[in-house]
Amino acid sequence: AAGMGFFGAR
C-alpha cells in the first residue's frame, strides 16, 4: 500500500 497513500498525502 504505497501508491495512493503516498501520492494522496503529497
UniProtKB/Swiss-Prot annotation:
One of its GO terms (cellular component) is extracellular region. GO terms for biological process: neuropeptide signaling pathway. It is found in: Secreted. Keywords: Amidation, Neuropeptide, Secreted. The keyword Ion transport does not apply. The keyword Secreted applies. Coiled coil: none annotated. The modification Arginine amide is found at residue 10. Contractile action on the inner circular body-wall muscle of the animal. This is Urechistachykinin-2. It comes from Urechis unicinctus (Fat innkeeper worm). The lineage of its organism: Eukaryota, Metazoa, Spiralia, Lophotrochozoa, Annelida.
